[in-house]
Amino acid sequence: MNDVSSAPSESLTEYFPEDLLHVVRENQPLRETLWLGIGGPARFLAEPVEIDQIEKLYTAAREKQLALRVLGQGSNVLVREAGFDGLVIKLSAPATSGLEIQGQKLVAGAGAKLTHAVIKTVGEGLGGLEHLVGIPGSIGAAVVGNVSAEGRDIGSVVESIEIIDEEGKRKTLTGDEAGFAHRQSTLMGTVVLSVTFNLEPKDVSALTKRMQKLWIHRGQRRPSESNRIAMPFIDPDSISACELINSTGLAGIREGDVSLDSAAPHYLIAHENATSDQCVKLIGRVREQVLMQTGIDLQLNLQIW
């Protein structure tokens, strides 16, 4: 984000100290940064260029009782039409999205793309993340949600996580302290700054072949008719969300201008003129029907702001 050239509004100066005004803007649209491409604006949107600024933003939000959210790649976020009445911190600057190899470890900024991290580590002959290639989202979101694929979750290779905790204190947690479980962790409510992964040296050629095979497979399953997509549900322990939705006859179900893909129903598609309200209604209908027919309570992968 470029510095704001005009004088800051009274609202900005009321909520944020002077040394943050150049990284915060008011009433900013979010839809351009979200995969679904719908929803209203953020009351305040900040794009910090230094880690210290994130700490100061967090402190300002706490002091002014502003709701706060962190935005990475926007692949699992749905914003309602009314927008988000609070502060959104977008992690897009190099200081928050870098990738650095240190021996057999990867130090990744929370805003870095997960797939970029996979490609970098595979190229360095380091195994442990290659099975996650093609999964959308940022490192921070992937770790908070303990994303998994091929029977292995990302938490299994996390050595440490640098965070700002719920009290605004910067600290480093071990992987064990993050409370990793099936598609969850105890990191929700914190701001993840960076993650260190402990990986295993492996043959570059073998890793590359495995990564390419998985990438092609996932690309073939992704809906081709639309780029405005999201995966709204977490796979239950015993069955994938795709299989579960197919088994209940809900593939292709539609609510206004929003639908589940007919071939890969774990994908939600926002067609032209789609709204966030339609997304919420469709998700609710699917969860209700799946619960009635199978007894399984589908949990949300999508964050609704």
From Swiss-Prot:
Q: Where is this protein localized, as stated in its record?
A: Cytoplasm
Residues covered by the FAD-binding PCMH-type domain: 37-202
Q: Which residues form a coiled coil?
A: none
Which SUPFAM superfamilies does the entry link to? FAD-binding/transporter-associated domain-like, Uridine diphospho-N-Acetylenolpyruvylglucosamine reductase, MurB, C-terminal domain
Any one GO molecular function term: FAD binding
Q: Which PANTHER family match?
A: UDP-N-ACETYLENOLPYRUVOYLGLUCOSAMINE REDUCTASE
Protein name from the UniProt record: UDP-N-acetylenolpyruvoylglucosamine reductase
| The species this protein was found in | Rhodopirellula baltica (strain DSM 10527 / NCIMB 13988 / SH1)
